[in-house]
Regions:
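Mature, function-bearing regions of proteins
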Residues: 2-364
């Protein structure tokens, strides 16, 4: 078993205790720079409403605001980003999860809270006015400037290094968020009185064209931003080597320890019964059942990148199809409201509800 940095063992065990209030969190867990201004809550210099980077009537909002997306967004995003090697390398080397694992203080709550903050901290960029989106993007860019390293994978030194705030990795962070959201909608969103189904090719291309604004917001290279599904597919082909499973990806370049093992061993060692709700939400649901369902609802390329062979991929697809009644149930009102507050936070709830009112009005 790997040892914690310096061989120290934490003596204060209060970090293990997770109250109901700590689990739910207050607005401060997600909020930066004060309460976010919702899309349409301010005006441009010419007096027209400022709807931010997307706005009512957009295909992105159609996809994002569906109850299925609210419930399953993190599971799908986490799946696709776990196949992009620079993201995994950044978590391994620079994420608070890694720091806590090395210090011996990692808990199931840490895994839960990281996922919990994810959706809610993106909501201001997707559902806020332009200034709100820019300020949150700048904040995340400044944080990600520290997420850089010279080695993506010790087993594949030819891959080079990573830098989360630089154009390539910033672009793929945005694209994996948006593309996984589209899969989610097409695979899980019951709508139009029927089963989940694909958008038309024109609507899919429109989704990508609208997503370009988000890529620009985070600093993606203009000459590579895809505006159609065909361009996105070509981009995946170009960066093929940066996607996929690897047995050495979680190895720390400096010590040779295995981050994944250190994480798992530390969470087991530091378990306290008060962490059970966090364990259920993070491990059993988000990284367990929901992730498995997402595998069946994603692309064949992603299933291959996740290490699934033909047999396991077929089982994943079949399992997701057989689970459609459960998927339908989880996007009903009580369940969606629970996940919205838990995973998007109070500000996220307000942004979603405000955007839904605008979206309904745009289609009336």
């Amino acid at each position: 078993m790997s040892t914690v940095s310096g061989g120290q063992v934490p003596t204060d065990t209060r970090f293990k205790i997770v109250s109901r209030e700590r689990l739910r969190g207050t607005a401060a867990r997600w909020r930066r720079f004060g309460e976010p201004v919702p899309a349409g809550g301010s005006r441009h210099a010419d007096g027209t409403p400022d709807y931010g980077i997307f706005g009512p009537g957009s295909v992105v909002w159609e996809v994002l605001l569906h109850p299925a997306t609210i419930v399953f967004q993190y599971a799908f995003q986490g799946l696709l980003q776990s196949t992009y090697k620079p993201v995994v390398a950044g978590i391994r080397d620079r994420d608070p999860l890694s720091r806590n694992a090395r210090q011996g203080t990692i808990t199931f709550f840490d895994i839960f809270e990281r996922g919990q903050r994810n959706s809610g901290m993106h909501a201001p960029m997707w559902l806020g006015d332009t200034e709100t989106a820019r300020r949150m993007a700048k904040h995340l860019h400044n944080i990600h400037r520290k997420v850089a390293g010279e080695v993506i994978d010790v087993g594949r030194p030819e891959l080079g290094g990573y830098a989360a705030s630089e154009p390539r990795d910033a672009m793929w962070a945005a694209l994996t968020e948006m593309h996984s959201m589209l899969w989610l909608y097409e695979s899980f969103a019951f709508r139009d009185g029927g089963l989940p189904h694909r958008l038309t090719p024109d609507r899919r291309d429109q989704f990508m064209a609208e997503s370009a604004a988000y890529c620009r917001l985070v600093g993606a290279p203009e000459d590579e931003i895809p505006t159609t599904m065909a361009e996105l597919s070509a981009l995946y082909d170009k960066y093929h080597d940066l996607f996929g499973a690897s047995e050495t990806l979680t190895i720390y370049p400096d010590t040779g320890d295995d981050f994944a093992k250190l994480l798992a061993d530390g969470m087991r060692k530091n378990f306290h019964r008060s962490q059970l709700p966090a364990l259920i939400n993070a491990i059993v649901l988000d990284h367990g059942l929901f992730r498995q369902l997402a595998l069946g609802g994603s692309s064949g390329r992603t299933r291959r990148s996740a290490g699934l062979g033909p047999a396991r991929a077929g089982l994943a697809v079949a399992g997701t199809k057989l689970s459609l009644p459960l998927i339908w149930l989880l996007q009903r009102g009580p369940f969606e409201r629970h996940y919205m507050r838990l995973m998007w936070g109070p500000d996220g709830v307000r942004l979603i509800e405000s955007a839904r009112r605008l979206q309904r009005a745009s289609s009336a």
